[in-house]
């Protein structure tokens, strides 16, 4: 039998039918639903007189529009309130395996909530009307975002039409140095291959450095696969995966668990499997990263200086660099560790899990917010993450440092709720996109790890966390 990649196995086991042009009908196991991309899909079902094909495939929560402060006042923005209320109404009418509404303890960012509930399992196909659905590939699952029309199609038929991507293996060999996190690995890779480097591919991450990562770190890495242009990212199943899933609310139990684990252990690329493209990186080469421009590929080590567009020979790239520097209000040659910040945001589906908050708290402990920093928002990814952080006393560390301890939600990752930047504000952010206006009109976003964000909060500028005793 021909050796198969992990992607081959996941894809082939879910093909319902294939056409001559390579288009397939792909079966979907788990459909994650939130308030932004579902209203039109539910409306389409109503107009056609259809029901959900498989109610028990749907897990839902509200996240993009929910406020992260003043919950006693409810949702103040009328459009946001309408979207959340509409989701409530639609789930009540159509049903779901589980629904975590606004202010429920289980509510949170869909890509944090799904895994912590055991709704994401190895071997699954997982879709959501959100581009960062690639997060769930950390479990040895095939996961990617879909558009609103596909959301309706999945609801009605449990399938989507798709064409198989090419396969890419990105190996990170060796051990990561102290202070280097999965976020740094992701940004480093994007800096090396570019935001179009993964276009048309499904990426499998492998190598010693990847195998040593926790599940939460693997989720961070796969979350960022879309920023490299890939359709999906994934990590092979190992004991770390199985240990994380065990005893989660929606994980199998008893004999079903044993059978599942037996199958899950096959979800690795076979020895001798051929990938369409491969990259190998050395973990020793990766330092803490900071983006300087308006694309995740505009990223450098913290010890670097803002690059000079005049040194770029490609005229298109040079023009892009010039525009980015103008928007970001930066001058070529400025050391990254001399750039001051106004706002710090620690949260998002990339970095709002308990390990992320622990990293940030370790830096913030016994320190205070720098005088030039206007606000530091700490936004847990779910009510359960918030509860665990408070059990560990992390909230007290943040509050004593002068940070804001918020309620769960997508928050300042995107300007769709009350948490947003104003024109010219510079933000150290643990989110995933630094596009123009992403965090608010005229806002300037620098992507970093949770520890690097916390360091910026207490020093007032980008700082190498390895220099902080």
From Swiss-Prot:
PANTHER family: 3-ISOPROPYLMALATE DEHYDRATASE, HOMOACONITASE, MITOCHONDRIAL-RELATED
Name of the protein described by the UniProt record: 3-isopropylmalate dehydratase large subunit
Reactions it catalyzes: (2R,3S)-3-isopropylmalate = (2S)-2-isopropylmalate
One BP annotation, GO: L-leucine biosynthetic process
Family: Belongs to the aconitase/IPM isomerase family. LeuC type 1 subfamily.
Pathway info: Amino-acid biosynthesis; L-leucine biosynthesis; L-leucine from 3-methyl-2-oxobutanoate: step 2/4
Gene coding for it: leuC
Enzyme class: lyase
Pfam families linked to this entry: Aconitase
Record's subunit section: Heterodimer of LeuC and LeuD.
Keyword field contains Cytoplasm: no
Cofactor detail note: Binds 1 [4Fe-4S] cluster per subunit.
Domain of life of the source: Bacteria
Binding residues annotated for [4Fe-4S] cluster, in chain numbering: 349, 410, 413
Entry keywords, A to Z: 4Fe-4S, Amino-acid biosynthesis, Branched-chain amino acid biosynthesis, Iron, Iron-sulfur, Leucine biosynthesis, Lyase, Metal-binding
An annotated Gene Ontology molecular function: 4 iron, 4 sulfur cluster binding
Purpose of the protein: Catalyzes the isomerization between 2-isopropylmalate and 3-isopropylmalate, via the formation of 2-isopropylmaleate.
Cofactor(s) named in the record: [4Fe-4S] cluster
